[in-house]
Each structure stands twice: as C-alpha cells, then as structure tokens.
Amino acid sequence: MNHAEQMNDLFQAVQEGHVEKLKSLLDADPELANTENQDGLTPLGYASHYGQAGAVRVLLEHGAEVNALSHSKISYIPSNTALHAALAGERSPEVIRLLLEHGASTSILDSDGQHALHSAAFHTDQIELIEMLLQHGADPSALNSSGQTALDIALERGNTSTASCLRAAVAAQ
C-alpha cells in the first residue's frame, strides 16, 4: 500500500469510526497519527469534527498531538486544533471531554483568531460544552483577534443559554 492509499484509508477509517481498521493502520505506521492529509487536516481534528469518540481515543492512545494546529488548505476551514474542529463539527460532548482530559488547551487561537470558547459561543447553545471549556481553564473574558469576548459572539448569534452561562462566568471572575 502506498502512502496516498494509507492516508485515504486512515481518513476514511477516522471519519466512519472504524476503530479496528484505524488501530491496524496506526500499529503498522505510528507516524500516521500526526500526518496531515492533502488538505492540511490532521486525523485527530478530522475524527473530532465528525464526533468519532472511538477514533479520537485510538488516535490519542497512539500519540496524536492533542494541541497540534492543522494547516488547512480549504478556504472555509481555518487552521485549528482538534478542539476547535470538535466545536465546529458534531459538537460531541464525549469527544470534547476526551480532548480536554488529554490536555487540549482552551487558549490556542485558530487561524481566524478564535479561542475554543469563542468557537463554542459561535456554533452552539449547548451549556454542557461551555461549562466543560470553563472547567478546563477557558477564560470567559479573553478577546479574539477582533476584540470580542465569547459573550459578544453568543449574543450576536442569539445563543441565549450560552450567553447566560458566560455572563455568570464573567461575574464570578
């Protein structure tokens, strides 16, 4: 199997959650855990985006860098971490919890200048995710590259539950 075929198999296994296939590929070539595809996306970011908790777990067990920044070549996908990808994609609480428990940083900026909490405030009104990020060190007063807080973004997006949660977090600081 050539490298291109390996990468296609890897990203297909990741997207579809084929854990045994993924383990087999990583056992044969552990470096695949941190190899970007032709679009500049990481396997961990891809699995996180698609909410594939089993694949995320396997990749982390095989040494995937939890805070690695992708180098996206796709115009509408910023270069980001797996945590950003999880928040912009399926928003799986299990995946986000796994990433945070494995040391995912909430303070890394993606190429759009957003912290994880800003991404969450933009994409979701799920309090559970906001609280997880706050419990793992996300700063509710942090500014993105445009000078906005996550609360500003939540209010713009009409994510009222998120806004209430962030208001309380700012008040508690």
Regions found by a protein language model. Name each.
Residues 72, 76-80, 84-97, 101-102, ...:
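Alpha-helical adaptor scaffolds
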Residues 17, 51, 90-91, 124-125, ...:
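Ankyrin-repeat intra-repeat helix-capping/turn positions
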Residues 4-10, 36-42, 69-84, 109-115, ...:
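Ankyrin-repeat boundary/"N-cap" motif
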Residues 21, 54-55, 94-95, 128-129, ...:
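Conserved ankyrin/ankyrin-like repeat signature
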Residues 1-29, 34-41, 45-53, 57, ...:
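Intrinsically disordered, low-complexity regulatory segments in ankyrin-centric signaling systems
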Residues 1-10, 102, 136, 145-148, ...:
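Ankyrin-repeat-protein effector appendages
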Residues 23-31, 57-65, 97-105, 131-139, ...:
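Ankyrin repeat domain, specifically the short helix-to-loop turn at the C-terminus of the second helix
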